[in-house]
């Protein structure tokens, strides 16, 4: 599949303070996410940043938050980002066809987001070297 940047949107999923220290390969994932985010910014791809229950899990980790602070942030209480009404409206308002997805935890929130986006008619690109979970088997 070829990605046209004019048709693409980036969805960052739950890379948050209180969860991130417990995931596998966190240093490598953080480095990869920084590289991905910087590259997508150069290409002017719009971003949506999602955070699961900020009161309990915290905000996006500082190294990434610094890079994405100007983009919309949406708090969610569902596993899927695409079950949150504000996120759905924001994604639909962009008229983008392709959603690039990265974040944590791969087997829950990232997976549910991808499945719901596919069901919603979007093409999904999962950046696997920018996804992780607490257990290696779930990554």
Residue ranges and their predicted role:
Residues 15, 49-52, 128:
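A cross-domain feature marking catalytic cores of carbohydrate-active enzymes
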Residues 110-120:
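Short Gly/Thr/Asp-enriched flexible loops that form oxyanion-binding sites at enzyme active sites
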Residues 23-26, 30-112:
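Active-site alpha/beta core segments
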Residues 1-4:
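Short amphipathic alpha-helices and their capping/turn segments at secondary-structure boundaries
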Residues 100-103, 123-136:
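A short glycine-rich beta-strand->turn/loop micro-motif centered on a GG-aromatic cluster
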Residues 8-15:
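N-terminal nucleotide-binding beta1-loop-alpha1 segment
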Residues 42-43, 120-122:
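Helix C-cap/helix->beta junction micro-motif
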Residues 17-22:
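Short acidic, Gly/Ser-rich segments with clustered Asp/Glu that frequently serve as metal-coordination loops
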């Amino acid at each position: 599949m070829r990605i046209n940047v004019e048709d693409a949107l980036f969805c960052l999923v739950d890379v948050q303070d209180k969860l991130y220290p417990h995931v596998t390969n966190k240093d490598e994932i953080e480095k990869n996410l920084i590289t991905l985010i910087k590259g997508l910014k150069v290409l002017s791809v719009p971003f949506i940043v999602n955070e699961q229950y900020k009161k309990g899990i915290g905000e996006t980790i500082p190294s990434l938050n610094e890079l994405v602070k100007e983009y919309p942030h949406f708090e969610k209480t569902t596993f899927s980002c695409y079950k949150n009404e504000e996120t759905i409206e924001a994604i639909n308002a962009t008229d983008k066809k392709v959603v690039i997805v990265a974040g944590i935890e791969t087997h829950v929130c990232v997976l549910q987001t991808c499945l719901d986006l596919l069901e919603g008619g979007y093409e999904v690109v999962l950046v696997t070297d920018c996804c992780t979970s607490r257990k290696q088997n779930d990554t």
